[in-house]
Every structure is written in structure tokens, then in C-alpha cells.
Amino acid sequence: MKIIGVTGGVGSGKTELLHYIEKNYRCRILLADEASHKVMQKGGRIYEPLVALLGSSVLDSSGEINRKEMAARIFSHEELLGRVNALIHPAVREFILEAVAEEREKAAVGADDAVDYFFLEAALLIECGYRSVVDEMWYIYCDLAVRRERLKKSRGYSDEKIDSILSSQLTEAQFRSGSDVVIDNSGNLEDAYRQIREALASGERK
């Protein structure tokens, strides 16, 4: 089983490409955002510490943590943001490592539901030190003008919001230097799909 990290800037089209991979390969796909949901939900490993830190005002009517309310609570509060991240990031990493170990065990014993690939997607894979977790890091590149157009059309983002998000992410050069494979998703999807097929076929030959 091969573990592949998938990263890239906002609006690069990672989700669409992962849908293609999921349909065409024996794989498991884990989104870091989904992992953060799991560890924060009621009964999750950091639910109680987060509520203790932020207070019950961040809970919704069912007792779950309202992520929008939490974001508003820590917005422009650097110290509190740091304390929240100090809880979330290690818990997410632990969740991911457990998922990887689970799939490795299935592959080792030849389980019926064993997979050939484990794809881990997150915008912060490189910054958060996941190079040591994955066998290969993929950077989904997309021309900035195309990304802006996608974000405006699909999410209704303003230029100001897009600029704010971009300023907090790695530069293209940093993404490229931290990755083994670059998939150019600036053009049509069929071309990106072809690059994916070639990258996986090349990996199998190594």
C-alpha cells in the first residue's frame, strides 16, 4: 500500500481530482478536515478540552461544537488560536496515523477490503510535517487566475477574502519544493486525470 499526500492552495481543485481517484482506484481517501471534525465531535478525543477552553457558548443545541462559532470566538485572538491549534493539530495527526496503521494492517494480512493507495488530503501537509508520514507528496497546481474565478463562482468569495486566504498559504515555489509530483489542474479535467494515471503508473514501476 502506498501513502500519498495531496496538497495545494485554495481553489486548486483537489476535491474534484480525488473524486476521480476514488472512482477508479482501490483506495482510501482521508481529508484532514474530516479528521478534525471527528476529533472535535462529542465523544471525540479533544471535545472536552476544547469546551473547557472556549466555554459552552461554542456549543449548538445538540451539544456539538459549532465550528463557525468557534472560529468567531478565536478570530483575531492570537493566543487563544494558538491554544486551540495546540489541541487540534496533534489530535488530527494521531487520528491520521491510526488510520494509516489500520490500512497497513489490512494490506499486511491481505484483507478483502485492503487498498492499494491511501490518499491524505490537506492544505497544510507540508507545513505540519507530514512528509515523514507519506511515501509521496503531490502538489495540485492551478493557475492563480483560474483559482480566483473558481472561488468567486463556486463559493462566492470576494477578491479581498481570496487575498486573505492566499496570504496564509504557502507560495507556489514552496509547494513545489516540498512535493514529489506536480499535477497541473489549470486546464481541462481530462488532462489532469491523465497526469494522475501517469503518476500512479510511474510510482508502480519504482
Model feature map: region roles:
Residues 27-40:
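Short beta-strand-centered segment that lines the nucleotide-binding/catalytic pocket of NTP-utilizing
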Residues 6:
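Hydrophobic anchor at the beta1->P-loop junction of P-loop NTPases
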